[in-house]
Amino acid sequence: MDPVDPNLEPWNHPGSQPKTACNRCHCKKCCYHCQVCFITKGLGISYGRKKRRQRRRPSQGGQTHQDPIPKQPSSQPRGNPTGPKE
């Protein structure tokens, strides 16, 4: 390894910055372009704000595609209706 000038900041060391700018391409070469590209493109990790999904509007026909819940008969007591045997 070549000695690095101690007066340079770490982000200005030779080889610390890629020669080309980052782009939106997700090919294998661009995914390994730099550490930031690898994290965002290769691993898919993004800490930015997430876009809101638009809710689907209900159809204009008024159909909900759901059957109404039928009324159930009143619940029957469980167990032996005459009581426990002794």
From Swiss-Prot:
One of its GO terms (cellular component) is host cell cytoplasm. Residues 48-58 have a biased composition (Basic residues). There is a cross-link at residue 71 (Glycyl lysine isopeptide (Lys-Gly) (interchain with G-Cter in ubiquitin)). Residues 1-21, 47-86 are annotated as: Disordered. Keywords: Acetylation, Activator, AIDS, Apoptosis, Host cytoplasm, Host nucleus, Host-virus interaction, Inhibition of host innate immune response by virus, Inhibition of host interferon signaling pathway by virus, Interferon antiviral system evasion, Isopeptide bond, Metal-binding, Methylation, Modulation of host chromatin by virus, Modulation of host PP1 activity by virus, Phosphoprotein, RNA-binding, Secreted, Transcription, Transcription regulation, Ubl conjugation, Viral immunoevasion, Zinc. Signal peptide: none annotated. Its main location: host cell. The keyword Repeat does not apply. Residues 38-48 are annotated as: Core. A motif (Nuclear localization signal, RNA-binding (TAR), and protein transduction) lies at residues 49-57. Residues 60-79 have a biased composition (Polar residues). It is found in: Host nucleus, Host nucleolus; Host cytoplasm; Secreted. Residues 1-48 are annotated as: Transactivation. The keyword Ubl conjugation applies. Zn(2+) 2 binds at residues 25, 27, 30. One of its GO terms (molecular function) is protein serine/threonine phosphatase inhibitor activity. HAMAP family: HIV_TAT. The cell attachment site mediates the interaction with ITGAV/ITGB3 and ITGA5/ITGB1 integrins, leading to vascular cell migration and invasion. This interaction also provides endothelial cells with the adhesion signal they require to grow in response to mitogens. The Cys-rich region may bind 2 zinc ions. This region is involved in binding to KAT5. Belongs to the lentiviruses Tat family. This is Protein Tat. It comes from Human immunodeficiency virus type 1 group M subtype D (isolate Z6). The gene is tat.
